[in-house]
Amino acid sequence: MSRIQQTFAALAEQGRKGLIPFITAGDPDPAKTVEFMHALAAGGADVIELGVPFSDPMADGPVIQRSSERALARGVTLKSVLADVKRFRETDPKTPVVLMGYANPIERMGVDAFAAEAHAAGVDGVLVVDYPPEEAGVFAEKMRAAQIDPIFLLAPTSTDERIADVGKIASGYVYYVSLKGVTGAGNLDVSSIAGKIPAIKSRVPVPVGVGFGIRDAETARAVAEVSDAVVIGSRLVQLLESAAPEGAAAALKTFIAELRAALDGAGKTAR
């Protein structure tokens, strides 16, 4: 059982919902990434999604695009992100880490080399935004062979056939994009999310995390009522964009702790 699977099994046993924060590796300061990861874990994150910056992040809105640009300008690469995970693992052997990004940096490194290096660094999962599930079978097999969970996106527009395709190859969890468009956009409609989750649950044998549009404890709690986990990214990237450097880690921890408390309340009402 992978670290991600163990985490979700423990959450289910406790009647709690997962909290999955996203930050871009290297933003705003590459030297702070590992400190930020520890702050997320200390605040109550169950899984950490670490964005691998890319020059053409087509699924991301302006906030995360700017974040990627800043990280790339500071020399952040896939190799340096893996080094950050390895440093994080030196003092946190428990919190799962998922790399989220695009195919190009992985393919430049080589899928086999990436799988080996990611496993050695302590990566638990990988979500490649631009790998459609119908073309990702071999990639998913190679990740699982390296004890890395391949994680896939589903959207409001996903057909039952697409959901079933994902169900055949996903492990760890699936990430349901609750809004059409790019990250950080729009307003949440929890009833529409609740309407889609049963179709996913009936075809996908792993937990469902919901993200895009979650901005505060209130929206996190509402989404947690109808999902297994809540993913929050753009709001955290904005927080880091505006925080004073010396207080950024503490601000992250405080914000995540507020979400954690809200989700634990949702978990209790769901039991």
From Swiss-Prot:
Its EC number is 4.2.1.20. It holds the Pfam family Trp_syntA. GO terms for molecular function: tryptophan synthase activity. Pathway: Amino-acid biosynthesis; L-tryptophan biosynthesis; L-tryptophan from chorismate: step 5/5. One of its GO terms (cellular component) is cytosol. Gene3D superfamilies: Aldolase class I. The active site is at E49 (proton acceptor), D60 (proton acceptor). It is an enzyme of class 4 (lyase). It catalyses: (1S,2R)-1-C-(indol-3-yl)glycerol 3-phosphate + L-serine = D-glyceraldehyde 3-phosphate + L-tryptophan + H2O. PROSITE patterns: TRP_SYNTHASE_ALPHA. Keywords: Amino-acid biosynthesis, Aromatic amino acid biosynthesis, Lyase, Tryptophan biosynthesis. The keyword Electron transport does not apply. It comes from the Bacteria. The alpha subunit is responsible for the aldol cleavage of indoleglycerol phosphate to indole and glyceraldehyde 3-phosphate. HAMAP family: Trp_synth_alpha. Tetramer of two alpha and two beta chains. Belongs to the TrpA family. This is Tryptophan synthase alpha chain.
